[in-house]
């Protein structure tokens, strides 16, 4: 499906296949002109998370809803994006101390929830934590396991989201 500057975003969004497992990538040529129009077709949610490394260069991954993922969550009212990233990592993994590093980038993804399309922008940060901390999965967020993984040898790639592969490569 292709889009032009004359496209009606809401019509385009309405034509997305809800049953499909496809990953959609949307490139907007004249970003300033069309981005707000595109966003208006969605309920927009800001989120933040971290690619957390330890002293062995292993990455902290969570297992949630049958997928390997990175810790992240919604930005609370009155909270900055970088504060949310640290808080979410600490809450979801039970960590007591996390050092926030540089911002890695932003990933946008769309999903259908409660009869409305949602556009979530997730801001990702590089972080560090100690491998000696006790990891406690946040069960109420459906996290069933947390592991420090060697990204080169652990089979996480066979069961994750395309966006997580992107963040892991940054």
Roles of regions detected by a PLM:
Residues 75-163:
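Unchanged
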Residues 1, 53-90:
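Conserved Nudix-box catalytic region and its N-terminal flanking loop in Nudix hydrolases
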Residues 164-170:
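Charged phosphate-binding loop/patch that engages nucleotide di/tri-phosphates or the phosphate backbone
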Residues 3-49:
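Acidic, metal-coordinating catalytic segment for phosphate/diphosphate chemistry
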Residues 52-55, 127-129:
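Active-site beta-strand termini and strand-to-loop segments that position acidic
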Residues 43-48, 65, 120-122:
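Short connector loops at helix/strand junctions that flank enzyme active sites
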Residues 49, 58, 145:
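Conserved beta-strand and immediately adjacent loop positions that scaffold enzyme active sites
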